[in-house]
Structure formats: C-alpha cells, structure tokens
Amino acid sequence: MTAGSPEECGEVRRSPEGRVSRLGRRLGRRRRPRSPPEPLRVRARLRLRSPSGAFAALGALVVLVGMGIAVAGYWPHRAGAPGSRAANASSPQMSELRREGRGGGRAHGPHERLRLLGPVIMGVGLFVFICANTLLYENRDLETRRLRQGVLRAQALRPPDGPGWDCALLPSPGPRSPRAVGCAEPEIWDPSPRRGTSPVPSVRSLRSEPANPRLGLPALLNSYPLKGPGLPPPWGPRTQTGHVIITVQPSGSCIEHSKSLDLGLGELLLGAPAARDCAHRSWPRLDRLSLGGYAKLGGGGDLGARV
C-alpha cells in the first residue's frame, strides 16, 4: 500500500488537474465579449398602410407579373398536327414560303417577345419595390428617433423616485438628520455666534428656493421654528399687513453692533441674535479693548535710546 500509493496518487492528482485546465482553456476560448444592452429599446413599427407601403406592394405585384411573362415565354409549346402537315406539303412552293415565314416568326415570334419583355417588367417592379422599402425603413427610423427623444424628455422632467423628492421645496425643520440623497439640507439658525464667523444670521436658506417661486417668505418662516429669548412668533397679527418683521430682544449689550439686512422682499428686518458670550466676536471693538498697552507704547519713548 505504501509502495504503490505515491504513483497512484500522482496519477489521480494529475488527471483532474489536466481536465480542469483543458476545460478552463475551452471556456476561455468560447467566451466572447457581449455587446452592452441598449439603454432605450424603443422601436416604431413599419407603416404598411402608407403610400410607401402601397408602392412596395405594387412593386412586388409587378415583379410577379414579369416573372409569369418570362415563364410563359420560355414554356415549351407543342408543334402542329401531322394531318395538317401532309395537306400543306402538296405544293413545294407553298412549303418554301411557309418555311421562310416560320424562320421570320422564330426571330420575331410571340414567344421571343415574351422572353424579352418578362425580365424588363421584373426589373421595373424590383426597382419600385426597393425604393418603397427604403422609404418604409426611413420613416420607421425617423419615428423611432422621435419616440426616444420623447422618452428622454419625459425622464428628464419626471421627479426622482422616493419619499423625499420634494424636500427642496419645503425643508423639514429641526436638527440635522440623515436625508435622502440629492436633497439639500437647510441651514439651521444658531443664535450663538461661532469663533471666526459673523453674528449676522445666515439667510442663504431663505433665498435658495428657486424651484417654487410661489412659496413666499411667510411659508418659509413658518417651516422654521425660530426659538430665542424674547422672540415673538412670526405668524402673529403683524403679518396681516404683508410686512414681516423679526426682532430679537437682546440680553446683553452686543446687539448694538448688529445691523438690519434688506433681502429685497419688502420691509423685512432681521435683527442679529443676542450673543451669549461677547468675548468671541468676528471683529474687535475699540471701545471694548483696554488701551493701556497702547498708552505705554506711546509714552515709552524711543527704544534705541533706552538701549
């Protein structure tokens, strides 16, 4: 068992490897790159009930008629009866004249005319059929292009699928949450100023609504819950006159540095929110800074003289 096992195992191992390699090569040779599928498989039908279809049918009919004429010209006909030949062969002169007449008839007989006329009629019918068929396919291709353009326009005008396709019109209020792909998240009005930023409120979300111009500013203000110390609701009785005024009652002295913003939407005044901590502002105030250091530098004299 130990002596014959290596050779047998070697033979057993080689055979499946060889088979697998051959199968792999065969499969690799048989594989061919497939052409990508067409994005729009929209194709119009052939308009057979049209002038071009009628001419195509007429051409096919003419081809069949010419073919029948040619077959009739080449069809073998029987010769005359033997009794008539014996009666007509009594006079040698009449026989000679008839032979001459037969020779001329063979050259210009009805069978020869049919043989010449049949192919000509077939050619004319084939020409008409080819021209009409070409017009049929050209009309079908033109209609197919129009259908594809209509489908592309419909796909371009159709809103994207999903529950949040209208999020660009009325953004949902509240904190930021994962939204649908392709929907712009509205900016949240944070009353507390950040470091390196201006305390002026961001109004980008109020003016970035070009999709639906009918939605006025009251609808946008109603969609955003504006919360702050002493902030009255914007939907109070003051909105009945058509003017929306938003004011913020400050708790400190930082409100005097803010300025009103004119958005071009009537009389709209947006006061800057009160800052909780006035130590981190985007611009320094000279009246708030201690000018002691500047006085020391000014009254110290020349530094070179001291040295």
From Swiss-Prot:
It is found in: Membrane. Glycans are attached at residue 88. It is a multi-pass membrane protein. InterPro entries: DUF2371_TMEM200. It comes from the Eukaryota. Its main location: membrane. Residues 10-20, 96-111 have a biased composition (Basic and acidic residues). Residues 1-38, 81-111, 180-211 are annotated as: Disordered. One of its GO terms (cellular component) is membrane. Residues 22-34 have a biased composition (Basic residues). Keywords: Glycoprotein, Membrane, Transmembrane, Transmembrane helix. The chain crosses the membrane at residues 53-73, 116-136. Belongs to the TMEM200 family. This is Transmembrane protein 200B.
